[in-house]
C-alpha cells in the first residue's frame, strides 16, 4: 500500500494521509463497524472495504460511481458484478487474493505425509506432526481463522448445483447462513480442542504475528500457516522461504478449496475531496 500511495502522490501532485486499523484502536468494534461509521459520517475521502460493507454502503448511497474510471474498463465480469450495487460500480479491488494453507513441504516429506485434500486427512496430518514434536502444527491469527470456516461452509454451495438459486434463497431468508457455517465452526473447534491451533494466542495476534506464523514458519519450526497469496506479497511475507513450500486450498469435502477475497477501494459520494479521491483510485487500481 505504501508503494501505490507514493505512486499516486507523485503522479497527481497531492498528499495522502491514511489510517490503519488495529485492535488497539477499536477493541470493541470490528473493522466493518468502523468503516460503516466513518463512511456514514463522511469522515474520509477513500475507503478500503470488505464485500458486505460495500453492499451496505452502496445501497445506502454513500459510495460514488466508479464506472467512468480508466481502471474500471478492464475488470473481469465476475469482479464487476461483485462490486456493483443498484446498477453502480461502487468499489474496485486493488488485487484479488486467495487464502489457503502454506505448507513446509520439507517437514511433510520428513514425516512421510501427503498434502491433505479432505478435513479428515488434515486432522491426520496435524496428529502426526504433533506427535513428531511440533507443538502447534498450524500457525494462525485472529484475522484469518475465519477463512478455513468459509472453505468448509461454502465449498458445496459454490461448486454444486444451482448456485444462483441457493444464494437467492439465503438472501431471501428461506435458508439460514448458520446451516452452512455450523460445520465449518465445528471443524475449527475440533482443531482448537486437539491443540492443533493456539486459539488464545490467535485471539490477540495481528496478521503474521501469531504463534507459528511469521518468523516461526520461515525458520521451519511450524509446518503450516493459514495465510493469503496475492500479487502484493509474492516476494514478501512468505514469498522467499529457505525450504520447499507448497500453497494449497483449505481441505474440504470437495478437495482443496481456496477462499478468494476482493476487498475494494471506494470513494465517499459526499467526500470533501471527492474528485481527487477518484483520481487516486484510478492510479492505485490501474493495471500498472
Give residue spans per PLM region.
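Extracytoplasmic "Venus flytrap"
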Residues: 1-3, 23-24
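Hinge/lid segment of periplasmic solute-binding proteins
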Residues: 49-99, 114, 123, 180, ...
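Glycine-centered hinge/linker elements that transmit conformational signals in sensory
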Residues: 128, 170-205
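Extracytoplasmic/periplasmic solute-binding protein
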Residues: 90-94, 99, 123-173, 180, ...
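A ligand-binding cleft/hinge motif common to bilobed small-molecule-binding domains
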Residues: 52-57, 227-243
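Extracytoplasmic/periplasmic substrate-recognition and gating elements
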Residues: 20, 110-111, 238-288
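Extracytoplasmic "Venus flytrap"/periplasmic binding protein-like
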Residues: 10-77, 106-117, 214-218, 223-224
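A local structural motif
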Residues: 11-25, 43, 112-114, 189-207, ...
Amino acid at each position: 500500500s505504501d508503494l501505490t500511495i507514493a505512486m499516486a502522490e507523485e503522479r497527481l501532485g497531492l498528499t495522502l494521509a491514511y489510517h490503519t486499523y488495529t485492535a488497539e484502536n477499536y477493541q470493541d468494534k470490528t473493522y466493518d463497524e468502523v468503516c460503516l461509521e466513518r463512511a456514514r459520517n463522511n469522515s474520509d475521502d477513500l475507503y478500503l472495504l470488505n464485500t458486505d460493507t460495500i453492499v451496505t454502503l452502496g445501497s445506502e448511497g454513500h459510495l460514488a460511481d466508479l464506472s467512468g474510471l480508466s481502471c474500471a474498463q478492464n475488470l473481469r465480469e465476475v469482479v464487476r458484478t461483485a462490486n456493483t450495487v443498484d446498477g453502480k460500480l461502487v468499489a474496485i479491488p486493488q488485487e484479488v487474493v486467495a487464502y489457503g494453507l502454506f505448507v513446509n513441504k520439507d517437514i511433510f516429506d520428513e514425516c512421510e505425509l501427503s498434502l491433505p485434500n479432505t478435513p479428515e486427512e488434515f486432522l491426520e496430518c496435524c496428529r502426526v506432526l504433533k506427535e513428531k514434536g511440533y507443538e502447534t502444527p498450524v500457525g494462525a491469527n485472529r484475522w484469518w481463522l475465519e477463512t478455513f470456516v468459509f472453505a468448509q461452509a461454502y465449498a458445496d454451495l459454490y461448486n454444486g448445483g444451482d448456485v444462483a438459486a441457493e444464494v437467492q434463497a439465503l438472501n431471501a431468508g428461506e435458508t439460514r447462513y448458520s446451516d452452512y457455517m455450523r460445520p465449518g465452526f465445528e471443524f475449527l473447534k475440533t482443531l482448537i480442542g486437539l491443540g492443533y491451533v493456539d486459539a488464545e494466542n490467535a485471539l490477540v495476534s495481528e496478521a503474521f504475528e501469531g504463534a507459528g506464523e511469521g518468523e516461526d514458519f520461515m525458520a521451519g519450526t511450524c509446518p503450516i500457516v493459514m495465510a493469503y497469496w496475492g500479487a502484493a506479497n509474492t516476494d514478501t511475507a512468505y514469498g522467499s522461504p529457505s525450504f520447499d513450500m507448497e500453497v494449497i486450498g483449505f481441505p474440504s469435502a470437495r478437495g482443496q478449496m481456496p477462499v478468494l477475497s476482493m476487498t475494494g477501494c471506494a470513494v465517499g459520494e459526499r467526500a470533501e475531496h471527492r474528485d481527487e479521491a477518484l483520481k487516486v483510485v484510478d492510479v492505485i487500481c490501474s493495471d500498472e
